C-alpha cells in the first residue's frame, strides 16, 4: 500500500529521485508539498493545485481539531471528500503548533494541556489523542506526536524533549489502528548533532513507512540548519521517504535535496502572496514597488502557470496596490507553481545524472544581487 522506490541516486551528492506510492496516488520526489492548514491551501482550489503540479498536500491536525473538529470531517468521508482533493494528503500531529502557538500550555510525559485560542477551552492532547484525530481526518500520511524544542534551548531541555519524543513515538505506534495510513516518525534533537544521531538511531529500528526531520527552521541560523539536515538525513533508511518539515525556500531545499531529503512543505508561497510578493527564480519581488507599475512583461516569462501566461507585472502590481482579492489568488498560483517546478527540475537533474552541475548553478544564482535592491534571496 505504501512503498518508496529510489529510481536514481546522484554520484556526487546524497540526492536521489524516487516514487512514493500511497493509496491516493504516487508522489514523484523530490517534491514540494503545499500547506492547507484548515483543509484548504489559502486562496487556491484543488484545480489550481493540480495545475500547479501539486501531488501531495498538507493539512493541520491542531487547527482542524479546533475547527471544525475531526468528527465533522470524518462524517463527510474524511479529508479527501471534505476538501475535494483526490491526491495524497499528509497531516501533522499538531505538536509544533501546540508548542509554538498555544499559550498557557503544560507539558508532561502524558501529553500537553493547552488553552484553545478560539474559546479559551482547556484541551488535552496526548500521543494517543493525536493519532485518533488523524485517523478520523483520514490522511494518507500521519505524523507521530513529538515535542519540538524552541531555539534557543539548553542542551538539557533538548535532551528531555528528545527522550519524550521517543516515548511518545512508541505510544503512537501502539495507538495506531488504521492500516491504510502511513505513520512517519519525527527526528528531534535541536541543534545538537549527537542528539539528532541518537534520536534517529533509536527510531530507525521501528521500520516505519517514512521519517521526518523536525525542529528545524525555528529561528536557528541557516548555516546550523543545513548542518543538522546534512548530519541527520543520511542516518535515515534509504528505502523510506525522508521529509524535512517546514522548509521551502529554494536554497534550503536545494541543500536538503543534496543531503538526501525527498519531501518538503512550507507556508511561504501563499503567505508571501498575501503580502503582495512573488517568488521569481528564487528571489522575492515586492509588487508594490514602483518599478512594476508600467512593467508589462509576464511575471516570469519562463513559468507556464496561469498567472504568468495571462497577466502582466503591471496588472498584478495594480491588484496588489488596490488590495483586490484576486491578487492573492494569482500570486499564490505562481508562487506554489514556482516551488513545485524547482523540485521537479531538481528531480529531472538527478534522473539525468547532472544534479551536481544543477546544484552548483543554483548555488551561484541564489545570491542577492546588489544591483537589485528589491530582490531578496529565498
From Swiss-Prot:
Zn(2+) binds at residues 303, 305, 308, 334. One of its GO terms (biological process) is queuosine biosynthetic process. Its cofactor is Zn(2+). Pathway: tRNA modification; tRNA-queuosine biosynthesis. Gene3D superfamilies: Queuine tRNA-ribosyltransferase-like. Binds 1 zinc ion per subunit. Substrate binds at residues 92-96, 146, 188, 215. It catalyses: 7-aminomethyl-7-carbaguanine + guanosine(34) in tRNA = 7-aminomethyl-7-carbaguanosine(34) in tRNA + guanine. Keywords: Glycosyltransferase, Metal-binding, Queuosine biosynthesis, Transferase, tRNA processing, Zinc. The active site is at residues 92, 265. GO terms for molecular function: metal ion binding; tRNA-guanosine(34) queuine transglycosylase activity. It is an enzyme of class 2 (transferase). HAMAP family: Q_tRNA_Tgt. Catalyzes the base-exchange of a guanine (G) residue with the queuine precursor 7-aminomethyl-7-deazaguanine (PreQ1) at position 34 (anticodon wobble position) in tRNAs with GU(N) anticodons (tRNA-Asp, -Asn, -His and -Tyr). Catalysis occurs through a double-displacement mechanism. The nucleophile active site attacks the C1' of nucleotide 34 to detach the guanine base from the RNA, forming a covalent enzyme-RNA intermediate. The proton acceptor active site deprotonates the incoming PreQ1, allowing a nucleophilic attack on the C1' of the ribose to form the product. Homodimer. Within each dimer, one monomer is responsible for RNA recognition and catalysis, while the other monomer binds to the replacement base PreQ1. This is Queuine tRNA-ribosyltransferase. It comes from Thermosynechococcus vestitus (strain NIES-2133 / IAM M-273 / BP-1).
Amino acid at each position: 500500500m505504501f512503498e518508496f522506490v529510489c529510481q536514481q541516486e546522484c554520484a556526487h551528492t546524497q540526492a536521489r529521485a524516487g516514487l512514493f506510492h500511497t493509496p491516493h496516488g504516487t508522489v514523484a520526489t523530490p517534491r514540494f508539498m503545499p500547506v492547507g492548514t484548515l483543509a484548504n491551501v489559502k486562496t487556491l482550489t484543488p484545480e489550481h493545485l493540480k495545475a500547479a503540479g501539486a501531488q501531495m498536500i498538507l493539512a493541520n491536525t491542531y487547527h482542524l481539531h479546533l475547527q471544525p473538529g475531526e468528527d465533522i470531517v470524518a462524517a463527510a468521508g474524511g479529508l479527501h471528500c471534505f476538501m475535494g482533493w483526490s491526491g495524497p494528503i499528509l497531516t501533522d500531529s499538531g505538536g509544533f503548533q501546540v508548542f509554538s502557538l498555544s499559550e498557557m500550555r503544560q507539558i508532561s510525559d502524558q501529553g500537553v494541556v493547552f488553552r484553545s485560542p478560539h474559546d479559551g477551552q482547556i484541551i488535552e492532547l496526548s500521543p494517543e489523542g493525536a493519532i485518533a484525530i488523524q485517523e478520523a481526518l483520514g490522511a494518507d500520511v500521519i505524523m507521530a506526536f513529538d515535542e519540538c524544542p524552541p531555539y534557543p534551548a539548553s542542551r538539557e531541555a533538548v535532551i528531555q524533549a528528545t527522550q519524550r519524543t521517543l516515548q511518545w513515538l512508541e505510544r503512537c505506534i501502539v495507538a495506531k489502528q488504521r492500516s491504510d495510513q502511513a505513520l512517519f516518525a519525527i527526528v528531534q534533537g535541536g541543534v545538537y548533532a549527537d542528539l539528532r544521531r541518537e534520536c534517529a538511531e533509536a527510531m530507525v529500528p521501528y521500520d516505519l513507512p517514512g521519517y521526518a526531520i523536525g525542529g528545524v527552521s525555528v529561528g536557528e541560523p541557516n548555516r546550523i540548519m543545513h548542518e543538522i539536515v546534512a548530519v541527520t538525513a543520511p542516518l535515515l533508511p534509504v528505502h523510506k521517504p525522508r521529509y524535512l518539515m517546514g522548509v521551502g525556500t529554494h536554497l534550503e531545499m536545494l541543500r536538503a535535496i543534496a543531503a538526501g531529503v525527498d519531501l518538503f512543505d512550507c507556508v511561504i508561497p501563499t503567505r508571501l502572496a498575501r503580502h503582495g510578493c512573488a517568488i521569481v527564480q528564487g528571489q522575492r519581488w515586492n509588487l508594490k514597488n514602483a518599478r512594476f507599475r508600467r512593467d508589462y512583461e509576464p511575471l516570469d516569462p519562463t513559468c507556464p502557470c496561469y498567472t504568468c501566461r495571462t497577466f502582466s507585472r503591471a496588472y498584478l502590481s495594480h491588484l496588489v496596490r488596490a488590495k483586490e482579492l484576486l491578487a492573492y489568488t494569482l500570486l499564490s498560483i505562481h508562487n506554489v507553481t514556482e516551488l513545485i517546478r524547482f523540485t521537479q527540475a531538481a528531480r529531472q537533474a538527478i534522473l539525468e545524472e547532472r544534479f551536481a552541475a544543477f546544484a552548483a548553478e543554483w548555488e551561484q544564482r541564489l545570491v542577492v544581487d546588489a544591483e537589485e535592491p528589491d530582490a531578496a534571496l529565498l
